[in-house]
Amino acid sequence: MNIPHGLKNENEMPETLLALDIGTEYIKAVIAERQEGDNLIIRGVGKEHQAMGNMYAGAIADIPAVISACEKALSRAENMAGVVARTCSVGIAGELIKGNTKTVRYRRKDGNKPISDQEMQLIIKRVQDKAEEQAREEVALETDNPDVEVRLINSAIVSLSIDGYKVSNPIGFKGSELVLQFYTAFAPLVHISAIEKVCAELNLDLVAVAVEPFAVCRACLGNNLDSNLSAIVMDIGGGTTDIAVVDNGGVEGTKMFGIGGRSFTHQVASRVGLDFDTAELVKIQYSGLLSNDLHTLKTLTVSDAERMNEVQNILNVPDRMKKVEKAIADNTEVWVSGVGLALSDFSLLEALPNKILLCGGGAGLSTLQEALATSDWYEELPFARRPVIHLLDDVDIPDIQNATEIDLDYSYITAFGLLRVTVDTLNSEEEDTGLRAKLAKLLQN
């Protein structure tokens, strides 16, 4: 992609970074300027709607179509920022992303010998190899493809202890037994290859591919890797719902299931007898979001006004309104069951965090927030009390400032996290103490 006339190359400006959130419903491009202390200032954003068929279950299904949509989103972000950014991270989601936390006990031959970089690298490599084998077996079973290949995309040390003593960096310590809780996430190689192809065609320097809820956790932590944040993060997209559990600042694991905003739209379309685009507007109008989506338009066209009237007329018909309510209520019940099932897999925790942070385009659906806040879905899970639900906004994200005139709401939080992952990756490449950087709770792929 050539640099448009009037835009400066990133080499001529302060260091600029790009987050590319390739979602099922929208592609979002966010350009940020990296400041001293790794604070970030958002300079440009771009958004482009995805056509049906571009994505499947959170993964790229049509590479040329996704490239075309990315170009449009990038162009808008670059025009707003006045600079072309090439250094980027991209998010990945979907049910075939396998993120788990394992507890490993390692008995050392000589407890009086200080732990070295080389020894820790060997331990981490063994843990990653074992996790990769398990992830490959799971994906092979789900895809009925015994030859499937997977690749490590994210890993993080959740906790470390030596002879029962917790440490943040084991290098130099003596001890006989090292207990390591280690989070790893793997994705099918075909999914990662598609992302790499898109970035290559866009002439982008891809520095990291990150599991999207993992990236959101990074956004919430900001520059403070010693944070004691404990929360459940839910990224509700168009095709999937991606969940991460953070305990005392460490990522316990990630789970995904294939119900997102578009499944609600399909239900409304099927039961009310509408085309997909009209059903989408009916869904968001029902949730009180249509006016929010349209407020970004400087002028309301005749076509926009006609569509709004059409949607309101549908909801004004009692029989149709009941069908809309029933479709959304039934799908919400299934979605909540999926949330409960996903959280039941976090068996390492005695109690789940009491705070649930929502983001992603689907998080704005009021029925989902209401179901989490008022129903009894949580009672069979290890919560100490009813969890508190919070819809994330840009003001909730530390160390990132929005310098644009765009309201960067919950739907942009994943992109914020991808920017933070980019900074982490660049820092780990710049530092000579590679393992020490890894042991700062975040390990890069």
Task: Locate predicted features.
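Glycine-rich phosphate-binding loops at beta-strand->alpha-helix junctions
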Residues: 187, 288, 351-377
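Short beta-alpha connecting loops at secondary-structure transitions
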Residues: 252-253, 266, 323, 399-406
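Nucleotide/phosphate-binding catalytic cleft detector across ATP-hydrolyzing
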Residues: 1-26, 30-88, 92-231, 290-295, ...
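Conserved phosphate-binding/catalytic loops in two-lobed NTP-binding clefts
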Residues: 113-118, 373-413
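Short loop/turn motifs enriched for small/polar and acidic residues
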Residues: 90-95, 359-361, 392-394
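A short, acidic, amphipathic alpha-helical segment used as a generic capping/interface helix at domain edges
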Residues: 335-347
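Acidic, glycine-rich loop-and-beta core segments that form the ion-binding/anion-interacting portion
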Residues: 214, 219-291
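Short, surface-exposed connector motifs at secondary-structure boundaries
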Residues: 177-179, 247-251, 348-355
